[in-house]
Each structure stands twice: as C-alpha cells, then as structure tokens.
Amino acid sequence: MKKILYINILFILLLSSCGQKSQEIEKKTKANNAREQKAYAEALRIAVLPTLDCIPLYVAKDRHLFDSAQVDVRLLPFAAQMDCDTAIIGGSVHGVVSDLVRTERLKRKGLKLEYPITTPLQWQLITNKTARLKQLNQLGDKMVAMTRYSGTDYLTDQALSGVKTSAKVFKVQINDVLVRLHMLLNNEMDAMWLPEPQATTARLYKHRVITPSEKTKEQLGVIAFRTDLLQTKNRKKQLQAFIKAYNNAVDSLNTYGLSHYSGLVLKYCHTDEKTVKAIPKVTFNHATAPLEKDIQKAKAFIPKL
C-alpha cells in the first residue's frame, strides 16, 4: 500500500512540475511575441518586389548594412505593384518601391508622399516569338500585358504615339510580374512590358525586344515614403539611417558587381542561374530625388487615367 501511495505522490508531483514548466514556457512565449510585435511596430517597413531595382535593399538586409546603420528595417515582399499600393495606403508600410506614375496617382488621390531615392528601374517591351512581331506597327489587334495606372501604362502610350497600327492595341492588365512572364513563356500573351531580371529570362527564351523604356530617357523608378508616417524625430532618424545603408549597398554593388550577389537575385527575384549570369550590367546610384521633369511627365499622364 505504501509503495502505491509513494508512486501516486510522485506522479502528482511530476504532473505539478510539468504544469509549472508548461506555464513558464507559455509565459516566455507570450513575452517573446509581445517583444517581437513591439519591435515590428517600431521598425521601418518597406514594400518590395521581385525585381532588380530592389536589389540594394536586399543587399542591405542580408549583409546587415541596416544593422550597421542602427536601423531595424523590415522588407515586406509583394509580387504586384497594386498590392504594394494597398500596403502603403493602409499604413502597414512606411515606404514602397514603385514608379512615378503610380505614386503621383496616389498623391492625386490625397496620399502625401516624398521621394528620397530614384531607382534604376527599366522595362522592355517584349513580343512573343510565336507571334512574329518585329515592329510596333504590328501590334494592331494584339494584347500587351502591363499594369494600369503605372509606368508600363504610360510607356505603352509613349511607344505607340505616332505609330499607325491596323487595329486597336489591347492593353491587358496583368499585375503580377512573375505571372506576366509565365504567360509569355507559355505563349499566352502577344507582348508585354517586363523589368529585370524577368526581361533577361524572356530574351534567353528567344522572345524579341521591340523597344526598351530607356528610349524615353526618363527615370520613373522611385522609393516613396509616406510623409505623414515619418513626422516623429525617431522616424526621421530611421529614414536617414536607411538612406545611409542604401548608399553603402549601392557602393558594394558597383564595386563587386551584380554577379557577387547572384545568390540574392536568385533568392528574392525567384529566377534561375542562367538568367542571373545573363543580366546586363546595371549601375546603381546613391539616393537622389527624381528629376522634376520626370515627375511632371508622370503628373501629365494622370488625367488620362
């Protein structure tokens, strides 16, 4: 009997000990979650895309340049500009990698934005090799994939300005840049605007470039920040530190070349090694505001939308 009693007591003590440990673990988990939520709320949050203009941010994050600048930056990945817009409109991010047409439209709708950084964002208008389209005037009655209210919408109009086609050109909204590329590779679209590195992938598959955005001599890529979310002394300090880390990432990219960071391109742009090796040389610039003439051209396009 005594032996059974001892066993029961030992079992009860063991259960009590396990219960206490479970409570301690739960308490620590809640405390850790609370700390992380607080850190996340205090961090500078940026909406990014799987495109080459975001690479300085990925370099700064993965190579701890933000940490060296003593700023906590969280990069929130999206596949479409529209989703980035939703994030910055809702205030879940402080900044967004975008283009001037989109951001000027957001400003027209009442959102206050500032542009401390111009990015090397460029697109290429690429036609499906099976469509045998070699010139812009052959796009009549064809579908061109782009994003409405964006730089690619603007560039489509610019490219076709003064061009006589046999019929109307259909601008088709495909927001997700990875889906857009997939549609080209599967021969589901006649033509489309693609940024890097997606444009390089398309070229490797022998699809034809009929016009690059560089022809317009405009730089539309920007990193935009919500002015009203950066009013406190701490947020302003964070932005300054962010720019410092960004510039350091740019220096590293220009010194060592994009090939040195091929792993980051693979990781964040969801591409392949063959594409990474074939990407043309890109020069990244320190943080500078966009040219006023480029802002005005984007503004002038807005009333058409």
Task: Outline where the language-model segments fall.
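Short, glycine-/small- and polar/acidic-enriched structural segments
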Residues: 24-166, 171-172, 190-196, 208-212, ...
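Proline/Glycine/Serine-rich low-complexity intrinsically disordered segments
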Residues: 130-137, 161-162, 167-170, 181, ...
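Extracytoplasmic/secreted proteins, especially bacterial periplasmic and envelope-associated proteins
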Residues: 61, 83, 87, 92, ...
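Sec-dependent bacterial lipoprotein signal peptides
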Residues: 1-16
